[in-house]
Amino acid sequence: MADDSQSQRCHGCGKLSQGLRRALLALAMGFAALPAWGWGGTGHRMICEIAWQQMTPAARGEVQTLMRLERGSHRFSEGCTWADRVRGDARYDFLAPWHYLNLPPGTTRYTDRLCPRQGCVVRAIETLRIALSDARRPPQERLQALKLLGHFVGDVHQPLHVGYAEDRGGTRRMVRYADRLEPISLHLVWDDLLLEAWAADWQSTSRELARGIGVRERRLWSQGDAADWAMESFGLTESQVYDQAADGVIDTGEIAAAQAVVTTRVRQAGWRLAWVLNAALDPSAPGPAP
C-alpha cells in the first residue's frame, strides 16, 4: 500500500465534513436523553483499557476532562461501548455503516472508492481523529468523537468487521461452536464467544496484556493508518477466519488458534488507539500526521 497516495486512500479525510459536523452535533444534543443500557462489549472495554494504560499523562488528562461531561460512568472504557449500545435506536441509524468495511474477495489494497458514500470504518476513524484533535470544536462534539473513535479503532481490528457484503461480515454464516448444540453466527463467535474467558476479569486481563506490549511491538504497531489496519483484518478474514469455518464446525483446536488471533488484535487495537489519542490530545506526543 505504500504506493497509494493519501488522496486515493481516503479522499476528504483531512477535513471534517458538513455531514460529520451535523452527526456530532446531533449526538452531542441527543445523548442526555438516552435511557440506561446494560453491560456488554468485553472486547471494546479491554481495548480502551489497554489504550488508557499506554496513554501519556497529558492525553489521559484530556480524556478525563471530556469524559466528565458524560452522564453516568466517566470511565473511558465504558464510553467505548456506547456506539453498540445505541444500535436499534433509529436516531443513530446513520452510525451503522461506520462499524465495518465490505470488500470484494481478493482485495489487497484499500482505496477510497471502496468506502461507500454513507461511510465506513476507515473513513470514520480518520475523520473522527481530525475532529478530536481540533480543540476549537465544542467539548460535547469532541466527547462524541472520542467515544466513537475508541469504538471504531476496536472494530477495524476485528477481522469480520472487514469482510464480505454477501454474508454481512459472517453474520449470515452459521457454524457449530465447541459443544453448543445450535448453530450460531460466525460473526458472533468473533465478536463475543472467543472473549468469554476474559469477561469476568477483563480489567486485570487488559492491564496484563498492556504490560506485555514490548518495544519491538510498539515500534511495529506505531505505523500505518486505519486503511492499513483494515487490510490486516481482511487478510485474517480470508486466510484464517473463513478457512476455520469452512466445514461449518469450529472445534477445540480451531478455537485455540482463533483466540490467539483475537489476543493479538486486541493488543494491537489498544496500542494503536493510545498512539492515535496521544497524538490527538498531547502536542508533545508522536503519532499519525494530521
Q: Can you annotate each of these PLM segments?
A:
Residues 2-3, 83:
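Intrinsic-disorder/low-complexity regions
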Residues 3-24:
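Bacterial N-terminal signal peptides that target proteins for export
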Residues 23-31:
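Sec-dependent N-terminal signal peptides
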Residues 33-35:
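N-terminal signal peptide c-region/cleavage motif recognized by signal peptidases
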Residues 37-152, 159-290:
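N-terminal, motif-rich segments that launch catalysis or mediate targeting to/interaction with membranes
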